[in-house]
From Swiss-Prot:
GO cellular component, one term: cytosol
Gene name tied to this protein: dxs
Enzyme category, top tier: transferase
Lineage, opening ranks: Bacteria, Pseudomonadati, Pseudomonadota, Betaproteobacteria, Nitrosomonadales
Entry-linked SUPFAM superfamilies: Thiamin diphosphate-binding fold (THDP-binding), TK C-terminal domain-like
Name listed for the protein in its UniProt record: 1-deoxy-D-xylulose-5-phosphate synthase
Family named by the database record: Belongs to the transketolase family. DXPS subfamily.
Domain of life: Bacteria
Binding site residues for Mg(2+): 146, 175
């Protein structure tokens, strides 16, 4: 079934094939991808869309000497398969297996580690300048999607690269879809570029490159006038100083190879625009590329998920609350940076389209945009993953907290995220947020508490954040009523002796389980900022050991805040802080990862017993 594919263990093997064999290789590679991801889960649509491009890049360029940087990196499965990792795909994103994103420590062909968007042009430019400075003639290539091109960092890099004489090739993979449909003026510009009339002025270098390449016609059901197209020297990318070439059919291997070979001979900044289709070659993914962007196990014969019925996720709890709250308060507006589905805003967007704002992959803009809304009477709710909030830290401080604006943050994927690994882990938000003045931070221990915290945060007259983990909680009954929680107050959940465990958020359940063995007192702290100082001081004064447990980096996290609180009160009871260690934690199964970090009941018991025996 995969006879030709199984003969490819490196790009050197690939380069020995003739053009006819490359077409068969693409067919086998696509079939292998579908069947492999069906068994492991992972990203599918984006990978099916770059099969031909990946083959062409490794066929034309001398990788790994020539550097290829993949933006975001979720579309690198074909790249991994063709660079000696085909046999490892069965353990994709599993403990001890290969990562779902490029890793420099995994392969010499992974030239730059990615996971977040819009970094590829900057990295490839740095590599191009390094080649220039060391006298190397190697090529540097950045592959970036149209969704990632909406981020400001991509344009900062284009602006810098166009002014240099470095040999960099930027390939815009235009599939008209990131995770959520792309938005804004740039996307409209690209759409017009693809569907506009034939221009009569053609740049000589573009003519040289395209040469005998046939025009793109009716590709991916685009408009009839879709591109016979070259572009004038006045286009956006040429204004940045690039030689623009395209758009060309990104699923035509022959066109890709001819074009890339010609570009390889050119000097200076080059920009190749290719048109592709997410999910190409697999009908279920073509019909619903969003569903197959990140997918669990499924039946490859029909694309149907092999899903187990589970508890309501925290994302769904937020989604339900947002719709309910929006019905009560017409000032509420929802904002997301290109994560409508993942952050649970679909229902809100459908019911309140005029109050929903997907700003694209532009986290910095999202926060300041929300700040402007808050200045003039709206009540913005920013739904964002913990890992992506990191990209807008200055905006959080300067534009929101400094002005004490009532912007609410629903921080999803807080803590470990399982198979997506360290690039997507929400390990640091408590550490980097709690030092900011004016903010309140809450961490729910169950689904119903999450709903009440969202309500409390929304009513707060200042910056607020509710951070919750990926997946489901313990299965608490969710009440329709919304109740205002007292700011900065925790609750005593179990009275014991000697040891008091202060649990934050998702760690309450394992803390209570551990307490049964230890006969420990357990407090559900609820608030990371402001802390319940009275409760902390009371427990510290009546117990011989205080233990803090959190699903956040132990350095600078909630435990550190508790120690600061006790120090301020001149209380010297010993404190044991449990949390995520000072390291990037590899991908795996969430429950197993927590156990390895000592954050399950057994780990908590072991850590406390070890402390008590010293």
């Amino acid at each position: 079934m995969y006879e030709l594919l199984e003969s490819i263990n490196s790009p050197e093997d690939l380069r020995r094939l003739d053009r006819k064999e490359l077409h068969e290789l693409a067919r086998q590679l696509r079939a292998f991808l579908i069947n492999s991801v069906a068994q492991t889960g992972g990203h599918l649509s984006s990978n099916l869309g770059v099969v031909e491009l990946t083959i062409a890049l490794h066929y034309v360029f001398n990788t790994p000497e020539d550097r290829v940087v993949w933006d975001v990196g979720h579309q690198t499965y074909p790249h991994k398969i063709l660079t000696g990792r085909r046999k490892d795909m069965g353990n994709l994103r599993r403990p001890g297996g290969i990562a779902g994103f490029p890793r420099r420590d995994e392969s010499i062909y992974d030239t730059f580690g990615t996971g977040h968007s819009s970094t590829s042009i900057s990295a490839a430019l740095g590599m191009a300048v390094a080649a220039q400075k060391t006298g190397s003639d190697r090529h540097s290539i950045a592959v970036i999607g149209d969704g990632a091109m909406t981020a400001g960092m991509a344009f900062e890099a284009l602006n810098n690269a166009g002014a240099m004489d470095a040999n960099i090739l930027v390939i815009l993979n235009d599939n008209d879809m990131s995770i959520s449909p792309n938005v804004g003026a740039l996307t409209n510009y690209l759409a017009k570029l693809l569907s506009g009339p034939l221009y009569t002025t053609v740049r000589r270098s573009g003519e040289k490159v395209l040469g005998v390449v046939p025009p793109v016609r009716e590709f991916a059901k685009r408009a009839e006038e879709h591109v016979k197209g070259m572009v004038t020297p006045g286009t956006l990318f040429e204004e940045f100083g690039f030689n623009y070439i395209g758009p060309i059919d990104g699923h035509d291997i022959d066109v890709l190879i001819t074009t890339l070979r010609n570009i390889r001979e050119l000097k200076g900044p080059q920009f190749l625009h290719i048109a592709t289709q997410k999910g190409h070659g697999y009908q279920p993914a073509e019909d619903n590329p969003g569903k197959f962007h990140g997918v669990g196990k499924f039946d490859p014969s029909n694309g149907c998920s092999i899903a187990q019925a589970g508890k309501k996720t925290y994302t769904q709890v937020f989604s339900d609350w947002l719709v309910d709250m929006a019905a009560r308060d017409e000032r509420l507006v929802g904002i997301t940076p290109a994560m409508c589905d993942g952050s649970g805003l679909n229902a809100f967007a459908e019911q309140f389209p005029d109050r929903f704002f997907d700003v694209g992959i532009a986290e910095q803009h999202a926060l300041t945009f929300a700040a402007g809304m808050a200045c003039d009477g709206l009540k913005p709710v920013v739904a964002i993953y913990s890992t992506f909030l990191q990209r807008a830290y200055d905006q959080f401080i300067h534009d929101i907290a400094l002005q004490n604006l009532p912007v609410m943050f629903a921080i999803d994927r807080a803590g470990l995220v399982g198979a997506d690994g360290p690039t997507h882990a929400g390990s640091f938000d408590l550490s980097y947020l709690r030092c900011i003045p004016n903010i309140i931070i809450m961490a729910p221990s169950d689904e119903n508490e999450c709903r009440q915290m969202l309500y409390t945060a929304y009513l707060h007259d200042g910056p607020s954040a509710v951070r919750y983990p990926r997946g489901g909680g313990p299965g608490a009954t969710i009440t329709r009523d919304m109740q205002l929680l007292p700011i900065g107050k925790g609750e005593l959940r179990r009275q014991g002796s000697w040891v008091a465990i202060l649990a934050f958020g998702s760690m309450l359940a394992p803390a209570l389980e551990a307490a049964e063995t230890l006969d420990a007192t357990v407090a559900n702290m609820r608030f990371v900022k402001p802390l319940d100082a009275n409760l902390i001081n009371q427990l510290a004064s009546s117990h011989t050991l205080i233990v803090t447990v959190e699903e956040n980096a132990v350095m600078g996290g909630a435990g550190a805040a508790v120690m600061e609180c006790m120090q301020a009160a001149d209380i010297h009871t010993p404190v044991l802080c449990l949390g995520l260690p000072d390291m990037f934690i590899e991908h795996g199964v969430h429950e197993t990862m927590l156990a390895e970090c000592g954050l399950n009941a057994a780990g908590i018991i072991a850590a406390i017993e070890k402390k008590l025996t010293k």
